[in-house]
Swiss-Prot record:
The modification N5-methylglutamine is found at Q249. Peptide chain release factor 2 directs the termination of translation in response to the peptide chain termination codons UGA and UAA. Belongs to the prokaryotic/mitochondrial release factor family. This is Peptide chain release factor 2. HAMAP family: Rel_fac_2. InterPro entries: PCRF, Pep_chain_release_fac_I, Pep_chain_release_fac_I_sf, PrfB. It comes from the Bacteria. Methylated by PrmC. Methylation increases the termination efficiency of RF2. The keyword Protein biosynthesis applies. One of its GO terms (molecular function) is translation release factor activity, codon specific. GO terms for cellular component: cytoplasm. Gene3D superfamilies: 3.30.160.20, 3.30.70.1660, Release factor (1.20.58.410). Keywords: Cytoplasm, Methylation, Protein biosynthesis.
Amino acid sequence: MISFETRTRMEELEKKYKDILSVVNENEVDREIEEIEKKLTDPSVWDDQKKAREYTQKLKRLKNISEDLKRVRSLFEDLEVAIELSDEDQEMAQHVEEIVQELEGAVKKLELEIILNGKYDPNNAYLSVHPGAGGTESQDWAQMLLRMYMRWAERKGFDVEIVEFQPGEEAGIKDATILIKGEYAYGYLKHESGVHRLVRISPFDAARRRHTSFASVNVIPEIDDDVDIEIRPEDLKIETFRASGHGGQYVNKTESAVRITHLPTGIVVSCQNERSQHQNKQTALKILKAKLYQLEMEKKQREIQEIQGELKDISWGNQIRSYVFHPYTMVKDHRTGVETANVDAVMDGDIDMFIEAELVYFARRSG
């Protein structure tokens, strides 16, 4: 006998599968794979390395989707047979439960593969954290967020490089940027941009009062050098300074840190992680180029958001997620409604539940 809970899960899976098939067709995916494979057999396509790389990335993504579409279809066929036999065989009812559990994982994986179809979704990601008003309290919160994303990246098997790290005077950070290197790093993290709110008993308050702190997160893709963005030397203010950052294994101290201000937009980028001033300058210019490119894309789409590396107002009205440590424990995303009471796991990088829900939420909003 199949339980009511399992039947409910089956109905939800069928709905999700129907939604998937409304936007992707297995035969069309296989046909597109054949077309790209045919193009890649032409030696002339490799004359344009950028185009060839785009083809190979797309081919890899389509092959993953094709394999997972076939797997999900096969699992649904197995489920149909198991359901027919379950009325007479209790062991088969248990097998239904096992297939449903396997299907849930397979459908979720397929959903994400279909959703992660943006031009720069496969790229590495620059992630910056900036504390809001509130001094040491918000600076400590910013460092907690930075660690959360580093732990998430480590869980994914991604590499993390500190690009900039400016410590707070007592604790925490005034500013930090990391480069997360891994397949679809930007695709996963792009909706983490926004204001994150913390409510807790402050460890810096002798009276043990409850404090609310804010920090902003900004995520941009690492883009290729051949992207056509003009940066005129006369538009740049370039300063050098001695790095004062710390961060254990991630930070390589240097006396050749570089700060670049793009005068027309006011965008400021810094780099202190490389071993020479020249390398720091090149990395900072690369980040600036990525920010300017994204700014152009936003203008073309007529979106109102600013993506200059910090939000206009790091305050009450703009938060995307709240992290409450006191008087109860709760982390809640205000866009998707996803929440959990396990704040320790979240702060240790267990944030896939939020990221996956964001991807589905924004994909449905965009239609």
